Amino acid sequence: MITLIGTGHVFNLRARVQEEIFRRVPSVVCLELDPARYHALRSPDRGKGKAPLVYRMLANFQDRLAEGYGVKPGDEMLAASDAAKDLAASIALIDKDAQQTFQRLMKEMPFREKFRLVGSSVAGLFMPGKSVEDQVKELEQDYTSYFNVMGKKFPTLKRILIDERNEHMANALVQLHGSHQNVVAVLGDGHVDGILQILTAKGLPVETVRLKDLRTERPAVGTATTGFTVETS
């Protein structure tokens, strides 16, 4: 069995993520990270200083959102890593190399698309003025429409940051399932549908735990607003 646990990188999900992992006692826990980003999460400065400009923009944006939830972006990945260690399970870093991915993105993205991305300043692009809570609820109901809009406005960004990474992570899970009967993957909720489609098409047994299932508690601070988030980790 492969279990896909869909998370949000700016929410406090540590306890719930660990609960789902402990419940399944997997032999391997997969993380939506590459080695460099995993070690950056373990370091005090989070390793953003040398990251590409667009990555730093998006990461800083997520930092500001996460402050309202009392967490640091990526805490759910560290929680999953800690749970794996408690279970003596293997840890698999299944995402593509972030540095190479963003280098490709900058190389292949047309100037007009770059201009739209930078000019938007990320926030307020699709749904200006909506609270984080309102936007998350809409995304949870219909990721397909969200990614369709992204694909029209930023086709290169969607292809490289979403579609190609979904394929890469799904292939990694297929290989791991060949040697592990019980696999848990912790990744951004926006990746779940795409990876689920690939895995089910290959006839693999898959179950999902979605972000809306994990978010049983609401944050004390609810004043942050945003219009656009792109899963980058």
Segments (PLM) and residue ranges:
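Compositional signal for N-terminal targeting/processing segments
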Residues: 1-233
